[in-house]
Amino acid sequence: FNVLGSPKQHVVDNTIKELNTHAEVFDMMGLPTTPYAKINIHVGGTYGGDFAGTAKRWCANFHRLSETAQARITVENDDKASMWSTRYLYDYIHKDTLVPIVHDVHHHKFCTGGLTDKEAMSLASSTWFDIKPVIHYSQDRSVEHNDPKIRAQAHSDSYWTPVDTHGLDVDVMLECKHKEIGLFKMRQLLA
């Protein structure tokens, strides 16, 4: 939906308008102009595996955003092997823009970029500077329901394994279908 690296100008123009509008709403709400009040997006496609070209467009268009939008943007790793791993986000996006990376533990299982989860989470955490890093955590819905017809990337209803932050001081956003029930389950698992 919001694709700063798109080769289509109308998609980029709509994305810039959308992200700037989100930042304006955050401003009206009095939220901090930092990644603490993040606008989290995926980089989007690679357009034939052209990571360098896509990243060049993404970074150039990122700099067209309002200052308050730029200050809040974070990027998240993808759940497909041919897409944006935490490593690629670091190498192609963060190094140019200093945009923080939200490491999604579940997505990492499908797009590792050659890193372990611990290495990827540590790398992503290093991009947050003085703001507490954020990670996303969900589990495999097909395992939860013992149904191989469900896509492995689909988020679970709840949790059966506690989140492993690898000793890092991070905020964990729980991404499960049963929302608060999942939170209570996670609290039990971590107790």
Regions found by a protein language model. Give the residues of each.
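Short loop/turn segments at strand-loop or loop-helix junctions that form parts
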Residues: 1-4, 41-45, 106, 138-140, ...
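Active-site-adjacent pocket scaffolds in enzyme catalytic domains
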Residues: 83, 103, 111-112
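Histidine-acidic metal/acid-base catalytic patches
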Residues: 99, 109-191
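Active-site acidic/histidine proton-transfer and metal-coordination neighborhood
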Residues: 2-100
